[in-house]
């Protein structure tokens, strides 16, 4: 039961992404290398960059399991994503692997004006439904270069924007989807 009504009956209210929880949350400039960042809890992220931090990540592994409990929050705000950039942060990821095997676990998600994620020379693989590769909403930006992105679940585009405000760029990317309703590129 949510909001006093059975699941699916009450309208869902999007929450403020600044309240999201995660395994690793970075709020100041930082460099990270050769790290394993995982999360197995519903509605949490493996990694969150926030507070206008500039974060450089190399040769690391990110993994997420644990299904979302709110489609709206995971689709539009980035809750339950593997890597989430908010509050004008800039996350630069190189030479890494990003995977998820849970519903509503987008791999790389930027939301909010000034939030930018640059991903290069990285493999991305999502296995469950509503789990996109690169996703941006509310004026967030994700730039990809030399990527292999594979999605297996339904409604899991490799490149996606939503809410009419989001920017994705992809250069030298191999993009593969196999789930129902999963175009390679999706934008609204």
Task: Give the location of each predicted region.
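N-terminal segments that cap or nucleate solenoid repeat domains
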Residues: 1-71, 92
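Extracellular beta-strand/beta-solenoid scaffold signature
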Residues: 7-21, 41-48, 70-84, 102-110, ...
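All-beta strand scaffolds that present successive hydrophobic residues in beta-strands
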Residues: 15, 26-35, 54-59, 90-95, ...
């Amino acid at each position: 039961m949510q909001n006093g009504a059975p699941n699916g009956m009450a309208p869902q209210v999007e929450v403020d992404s600044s309240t999201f929880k995660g395994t690793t949350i970075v709020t100041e400039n930082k460099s990270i290398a050769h790290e394993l960042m995982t999360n197995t809890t519903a509605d949490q992220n493996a990694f969150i960059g926030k507070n206008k931090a500039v974060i450089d990540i190399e040769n690391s592994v990110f993994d997420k399991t644990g299904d979302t409990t709110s489609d709206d929050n995971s689709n539009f705000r980035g809750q339950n994503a593997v890597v989430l950039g908010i509050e004008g942060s800039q996350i630069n990821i190189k030479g890494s692997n990003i995977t998820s095997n849970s519903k509503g676990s987008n791999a790389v998600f930027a939301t909010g004006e000034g939030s930018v994620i640059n991903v290069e020379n990285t493999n991305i693989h999502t296995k469950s439904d509503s789990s996109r590769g690169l996703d941006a909403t509310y004026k967030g930006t994700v730039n990809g270069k030399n990527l292999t992105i594979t999605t297996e679940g339904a409604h899991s585009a490799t490149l996606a924007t939503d809410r009419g405000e989001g920017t994705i760029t992809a250069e030298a990317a191999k993009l593969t989807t196999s789930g129902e309703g999963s175009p390679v590129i999706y934008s609204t």
